[in-house]
């Protein structure tokens, strides 16, 4: 349930992981138990209930599930409460023993503790869920990071953007090609493509952030593009996916100069891009983004890094909304256009806002 409630805010869900991952994150984040039921009331046992429990405790300190259920029926309490009562009763017993005679209690303690732990773990079912969820959340968040670009961003996979990007790019280009091309307009389709790239992509996302720093270097860009793939979710995935490491350079150049399409010069390859910019959209099979491209086109023709052959249409959602800035800083702001709404306004810090 939590995930559903929360998902809307986290656009990441595009990747899918997001839902659960976010969920998990939440508990650790700050509202530990709220999504669950509020605190359980303190269970008060009546004298008759205590008598039944104590009688069983006298028989065995570690009643099995069947015994616990039987007693639970007798005293009309959930089995979980019975389990917890036994756990606490054993602890009390142990404490008394320790205070009474430290030496004797130790062996007992040793014996009981392992068992106790096991029963404890079961009982923890009731208590620990929060803890569990948080731990799960952290782990899941980590895993999700891999899956979600957004998460990844958080995770800061950026570490070796280049490597990741490069690796991604190659496969990406190929894989993306086919699917992406299919849906010019459909970001979703692209999404699907990216997903395969998903894990790497996220990495790329991170890289992207890193790349942003390194934006100047064309190479970094390629990576970032790779990340783009992961972005695929929101953006016309194709663009991201397309950013094969290869062409990225071209795009990059263009990107940073939307206004100076030919600034591509930085990337020789981009030169092609420069020319095609306008047309490429059409050509690229991956035109998926083309729908977007169009919008983008207007803004930045060169964007279509048509040259890139990868159908990364600049349209790919890289709007260089701030041309001047973009030009100034090689770091291109990839503002993913409308669909993507990712405005990398801050080139330096790309926020991967997953929508």
Swiss-Prot record:
Subcellular localization(s) per the UniProt record: Nucleus
Region listing for Disordered, in residue ranges: 92-144, 257-306
Compositionally biased tracts (Polar residues): 94-103
Residues in the DNA-binding region annotation: 38-97
Expressing tissues: Brain: restricted regions of the developing rostral brain including the presumptive cerebral cortex and olfactory bulbs; expressed in the developing olfactory, auricolar and ocular systems, including the covering of the optic nerve.
CDD domains: homeodomain
Predominant location: nucleus
Stored PANTHER family: HOMEOBOX PROTEIN, HOMEOBOX PROTEIN OTX1
Purpose: Probably plays a role in the development of the brain and the sense organs. Can bind to the BCD target sequence (BTS): 5'-TCTAATCCC-3'. May play a role in the specification or differentiation of neurons in the deep layers of the cerebral cortex, and also in cerebellar regionalization during early development.
Name under which the protein is recorded: Homeobox protein OTX1
Organism encoding this protein: Rattus norvegicus (Rat)
């Amino acid at each position: 349930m939590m995930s559903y409630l929360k998902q809307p805010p986290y656009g990441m869900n595009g990747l899918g992981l997001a839902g659960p991952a976010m969920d998990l994150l939440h508990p650790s984040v700050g509202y530990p138990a709220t999504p669950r039921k509020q605190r359980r009331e303190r269970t008060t046992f009546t004298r008759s209930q205590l008598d039944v429990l104590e009688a069983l405790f006298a028989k065995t300190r570690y009643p099995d599930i069947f015994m616990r259920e039987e007693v639970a029926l007798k005293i009309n309490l959930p089995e979980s409460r019975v389990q917890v009562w036994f756990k606490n009763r054993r602890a009390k017993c142990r404490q008394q023993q320790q205070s009474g005679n430290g030496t004797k209690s130790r062996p007992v303690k040793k014996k009981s503790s392992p068992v106790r732990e096991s029963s404890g773990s079961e009982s923890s079912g009731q208590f620990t869920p929060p803890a569990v969820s948080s731990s799960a959340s952290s782990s899941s968040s980590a895993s999700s990071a891999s899956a979600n670009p957004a998460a990844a961003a958080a995770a800061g996979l950026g570490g070796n953007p280049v490597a990741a990007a490069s690796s991604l790019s190659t496969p990406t280009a190929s894989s993306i090609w086919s699917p992406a091309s299919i849906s010019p307009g459909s970001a979703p389709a692209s999404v699907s493509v990216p997903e395969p790239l998903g894990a790497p992509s996220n990495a790329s996302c991170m890289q992207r952030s890193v790349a942003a720093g390194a934006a100047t270097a064309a190479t970094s860009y390629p990576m970032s593009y790779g990340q783009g793939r992961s972005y695929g979710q929101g953006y016309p995935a194709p663009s991201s996916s397309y950013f094969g490491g290869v062409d990225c350079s071209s795009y990059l150049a263009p990107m940073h100069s939307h206004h100076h399409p030919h600034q591509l010069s930085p990337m020789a390859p981009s030169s092609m891009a420069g020319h095609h910019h306008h047309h490429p959209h059409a050509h690229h099979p991956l035109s998926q983004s083309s729908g977007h491209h169009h919008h983008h086109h207007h803004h930045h023709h060169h964007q279509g890094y048509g040259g890139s052959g990868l159908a990364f249409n600049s349209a790919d959602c890289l709007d260089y909304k701030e041309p001047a800035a973009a030009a100034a800083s090689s770091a291109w702001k990839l503002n993913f256009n409308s669909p993507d709404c990712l405005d990398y306004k801050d080139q330096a810090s790309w926020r991967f806002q997953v929508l």
